[in-house]
Amino acid sequence: MSGTSQVLQNDSHQSQHASMAYNQRQPMMYPPPPQQQPLHSQNSLPPLPPIPAPSLPPISNNISNGNTNELNNNNQQQQQHGQPPLPPPPINANQQYYAVPPLRAPPPLNTLSSVVNSLPTLTPTLTNATHSTMSSNSSAESSASSSSNSITKPKSKRSSKGRVFQCTGYPGCNMSFTRSEHLARHKRKHTGERPFTCPYCSKNFSRLDNLRQHKQTVHAYETYLTKDNRDSKLLIERSKSKKKLKQQEKKAQQQAQLQAQAQAQAQAQVHMQQHQQNGYNFQPPYPQFHNQYYANNQYQGPQPPPPPAPQQQVPGQQQPQPQQGMPAGYLDPYRQYPPNTTFDPMALPPPPKINAHPQKPLPPLPHQMGGGQEQPSDNVSQQGLKIPDHAFTPKRRPEPLALQHSTHSNENISNEGNINANTNTNMNTVTSSITSDAVYPPPPRSATSAASLTPNLASPLSPLFHQSFSQTTLKSTPDPRGSTITNSSISIKSPMSQHFSILSGNSNYSNNTTNSLPSVSNLPHPNWGSTNGTTGSNGTSGGSYQQNSFHQRQSSVVSDFSIFSNSDNRKDIKSNWLKGVLNDDNNNNNNNNNEQQQQQLQDPKLASPAPTLPPVSSITGGGTSNGNDSMMVDNMENKNDVSQSNVIIDSNNNNGDKMVNKLNFQSIELHDNNNNNTPSIKSTHSTETIQTTMVVVNKSDPPPLSTPTTNTNTNTNSTATTNATGYVSKKPTINNLISQ
C-alpha cells in the first residue's frame, strides 16, 4: 500500500510540474480544472481522467449527456479493474473560449472527492431540464385535451340534465326541452300550425310573442284606441266573421265552377250526339272552347243551371254574343239553312237560326239557354275596363286679366279707333318696321319719364301704355310750354308736372268727367328750359329751337324726343323714333322738313289766313283789357300776386303757338331773366276744382299761321295771347268768375 501511495504522489508531482510548465509557456491559458488531480478514495483507486465537458462547445444536451455517461462508465470500469489512468488530453487553441479560470493552489483531496461525487448529479439536472420541457409540452397537450373534454362534457350534462321533453316523431330532430309548452311551441314548426290571429288584419302567427310584437308595431294606433277588452273582443269577432265569410265565398265559387264545368261537358256531349244523329260532323272545337272558357274564368260567380225544359230563343238576344271573344268563322257551313227558325236543343241545332244575323254568327253558350242568357254579358263587361260616367275635364289655367287704364272706358277706345282711322288718311305717313299703322305715339327712351304719370306703371313698350296715351295725340297739338291740365281723380306729384305742360283734349270732344291721362307725345324735351332761355335771350326764331331740339335728340341719351305743333312732323317722329335713337341718316331729312314748315309758319303768304275766335269775354260774360279779336287774359291782378292760381309765361320768342290755361290745382310761375337763362319755378297747391280753357287745332286742316300777340316786359309778368282754329270750351275761367 505504501508503494502505491508513493507512485501516486510522484505522479501528482509530475502532473503539477507539467501543468506549471505549460502555464509558463502559455500565460493566457488557464491550468486544467482540479478534477485532473488523482482521486484518493478510501479504496485508493487510480485517479480519474479530466472531465472534457467544459471544453466542448454547447452543441446539444444529448451529446453532453452521452459524454458524461461514457465518462462515468469508464470511471466505474477503471475503479473496478484497477487500470492505470489515461493521460490527460492535449489542450488545443480552439478550446481557449471554454477555459476555466486558474486556481492559485490545487484544491485539497476532500474537495476533489466531493466534486467527483457531485459530478453524477450534474447530468440528471440536464436530463431533468430536457424532460421538464418535454413534460411541459405533454402537460399542455394534456391540459388542452382535458379542457376540450371539459367543454364537451358540460354540453352533454346540460342536454341531459332536466330536459325530459324530447321532440319525437320527426326524423332528424333531437331537440329536448325542460317544459312541455316549449315542446308544443317547437312542434308547430313541424306542423305549420298558426293558432294566433291578429284581430285587426286577420294575420296568423305560430307564437303568441310574435303576435304581440305585430300588434305593438303594425297596429300600435289601434291597440292604443282599443285598450278596453270589450273592443278587442269585438275586433276579434269581426275578424273571425270576415274569415268565415271569405271561406264561404271561396267554397261557393269552387262549387259553382265545378257545376258549370260539369254542365258544360254534359251539354257538349248532348250536342255531339245530336249532330251525330242528324249527320253533322261537328267536332271538338265547340266543347273544348267552353271548357277553356270556364277554366279561364274561374273567378266568376255561380251561374244558374239551364232549365231542363226546352225553350225558344229570340234572335235579338244574340247581340251581346260577339263580346264573348269566340271565333266567328267555324259556323260557316250552317249558313245555307233558311233563317227565322226557332232553336230546340232536343231537335235541331242552333245554326239555322243564326242566319237571321249574318254579321253575328256566334252560337249561344250552353248556359245561356233559359234564364242565364244575359249573365255572361254582364260578366264580360265586368272583366273589361270600366269607363267613368263623367267626362274628364282638366283644370285650365285662368286667363290673364285684361289690364286697362283706370281712366279708360270702352266708349273712349271705340271712339279712338274711328278718330285714328279718319286722321291717318290725311297724314303723310312714313312706313316703319316697328309701328306700321302709326296709331300709337313713339315710346320714350326711358320709362321713368312717364312712369310717374301712370298709376298702374305699365311698360313703355306694352300696347296698354300706348292705348292710355293715344287719345290726345291726334286731337290736340299743344306747345311744349303750355299749361298743365290734370284729372280731378289723380294728383300728379312728379317733378315733370311742375316743369312741363301736359294737355288732354278729351273735354273738347265729349263732356266726359273722367279725362284720360295725357299722351306721351305731349311730354316736352327735358332740356327745353335751357334752349328756351338761349333762344329767348338771343331773339332767335322758333326754327332754331326745333333744330336745336333735334340736335339734342341725336346727341343726348337722356333726352326723350322733340315735339312739334305740326301733325306731319309729329307723324315723322312717330315712325322714325327708333332710327333717331340709332343715329340714322334719316334725321337730316327730318331737319329739312322742319325748316320748311317753320318757314311756312313765319311767312304769312305760305299759310292760309287764320280765322279769328270770339273774345273770351263774350263767352264768359267778362270784359277784356284790349279790343283785339284774339283771346286775351287779364293780367292786372297777377302782376304782384304769387299765390293766385295763374300761369304766366315770359318769353322773347315771337313765333310758335301759344295757349293759356288757368289752373288752381298747381300754380306755376316761370320768370325769365336776361342774366340767368334757367326759369325759376314756384308752385302752390289748392283744393278747388279744375277749370280749364282750351284751344284745339283741327289736324285735318292745313297748318294755320298763328300770329300771337305777346306783351313782354323785362321785370314784370306778362301774358300770351293765342290765335288758333278749332273749338273753345265754354267753361268759365277763375279770373272771369272773380271779376264778375
Curated annotation (Swiss-Prot):
Gene Ontology BP term (one): single-species biofilm formation on inanimate substrate
Matching InterPro entries: VerF-like, Znf_C2H2_sf, Znf_C2H2_type
Positions carrying Phosphoserine: 556
Null allele phenotype: Produces poor biofilms and decreases infection on rat denture models. Increases phagocytosis of the fungus by host cells in presence of estrogen. Decreases expression of GPD2.
Region annotated Disordered, chain positions: 1-105, 126-164, 269-385, 404-454, 472-491, 513-552, 579-644, 698-726
A single GO cellular-component term on record: chromatin
Keywords: Metal-binding, Nucleus, Phosphoprotein, Repeat, Transcription, Transcription regulation, Zinc, Zinc-finger
Modified residues (Phosphothreonine): 191
Coiled-coil intervals, chain numbering: none
Keyword Repeat listed: yes
Post-translational modification summary for this protein: Phosphorylated at Thr-191 and Ser-556 by CBK1. Phosphorylation by CBK1 is required for ALS1 and ALS3 expression, adherence, and biofilm formation.
Induction section of the entry: Expression is under the positive control of the hyphal regulator TEC1 and repressed by TUP1. Also induced by acetic acid-stress in a MNL1-dependent manner.
An example molecular function term from Gene Ontology annotations: DNA-binding transcription activator activity
UniProt zinc finger (C2H2-type) residues: 165-190, 196-219
SUPFAM superfamilies: beta-beta-alpha zinc fingers
Protein localization: Nucleus
Miscellaneous comment: Implanted medical devices, such as venous catheters, are a serious risk factor for C.albicans infection since they are substrates for the formation of biofilms, which in turn serve as reservoirs of cells to continually seed an infection.
Function, as annotated: Transcription factor which acts as a master regulator of biofilm formation. Biofilms play an important role in pathogenesis and produce many infections such as oropharyngeal candidiasis or vulvovaginal candidiasis. Controls the expression of genes that govern cell-surface properties such as ALS1, ALS3, HWP1 and HYR1. Down-stream component of the hyphal regulatory network that couples expression of cell-surface genes to hyphal differentiation.
Name the UniProt record assigns to this protein: Biofilm and cell wall regulator 1
Organism of origin: Candida albicans (strain SC5314 / ATCC MYA-2876) (Yeast)
